[in-house]
Amino acid sequence: MKKLITYSSIIAVLIFGSSFNQPDAKNYYDTGLASLNQKDYIKAIGDFTNAISMNPKYGDAYFYRAYSKELLGKKMGFISTELCSDLIYSMVYGKTEASDKIGELCTGDCFNMESAFVEPEIVYCADFSSQILTDIPDGVENLQYLIKLNMFNNKLVTLSQKWSHLTKLISLDLGSNRITLLPPVIGKLTELKELNLNKNLLATLPAEIGNLKNLKTLTLRQNGLKVLPANIGTLTELEDLDLALNMLTTLPTEIENLKKLKRLILVGNEISAKEQQRIKTLLPNTTIAFE
C-alpha cells in the first residue's frame, strides 16, 4: 500500500509539475510579440491564435493578431477585412486603441438594405438612410460585427429593444428622424464614439445617456431640448457637443467635468448673458459659440 501511495504521489507530482512547462496564453502572446518584432507575421498570427484559443477574452492578443494581419497584407499587397473582427473583439475585451484602428480600416464600404443581410458576417458598415423605416430591420441580430450604422432621414419615433443587439457600434447617425423619446436601450451602446441626433423632436435625454463613456462627438442640433441631465458630465471623453437650435436656458454644473471638450455650440438657444459667463467659467478651455 505504501508503494502504491508513493508511486501515485510521484505521478501526481510529475503531472502537476509538467503543467508549469506547458505554454499558457501569456507565453503564446509574448512569443507572438517577439515574432511580430522579427517581422515573422505568419508565426505571430499563429502564436496570437494559440493565446486566444486558451483565453477567448484576450483583448491584446486579438489586437496584435489584427496588426500582424494588417502588416502581412501590406507586405503581400492586399488588406483582408478578416482583421476587422479581431479589432472588434479587441475593443469589446478592453483594448481602447482598437476603436481608432476600426475607424481607420473597417468602415470604408457600407452595405445597403438589399445586401447587408446576404452575408451578415462581413458587414461592418450599413447605410439604411432614407428608407422610410420606423424601426431597424429584422435580422439585425445577425450583424454581429456592425460598427457603423447610418439611419439618417427615416421615420423613427423611438428605439426598440432590437437595438440592444448593436453593442459594438462606434458610429450611429439618427439624424432627421422623428424621435420624441430616447429610451434606456441607448445606454447599452457603450462603445459609441459618434452619435448624431440632429433634427429630431427630443425634449429631454434619458439618464442612460451617461453610460456612453466613449463618446467623443454628440450632435443634438435642432431638437426641442429644454434641459440636459446632470450625468452629461460623465461623458468625460467628449470633445464636440452641438446643442444649437434648442430651447435651453441653462446647462448643469456637471459640464465642468468635460475636461476634454474642445467645442460647444449653443447658437439659437435662450441663454442670458449672465448664464453665458457662468458656462465660460465652467469650461475655460472650451471654444463656445453662443451666436
Question: What do the predicted segments below correspond to?
Answer:
Residues 2, 7, 16-126, 131, ...:
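Alpha-helical tetratricopeptide repeat
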Residues 11-12:
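Repetitive helical segments and hydrophobic/amphipathic motifs
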Residues 49, 134, 167, 180, ...:
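Ser/Thr-centric signal marking residues that sit
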Residues 75, 81-82, 89-102, 166-204, ...:
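A generic tandem-repeat structural signature
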Residues 120, 141-146, 164-169, 187-192, ...:
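Leucine-rich repeat
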Residues 124-127, 147-151, 169-174, 192-197, ...:
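Conserved hydrophobic beta-strand positions in leucine-rich repeat
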Residues 131-134, 157, 180, 203, ...:
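Conserved positions within tandem-repeat grammars
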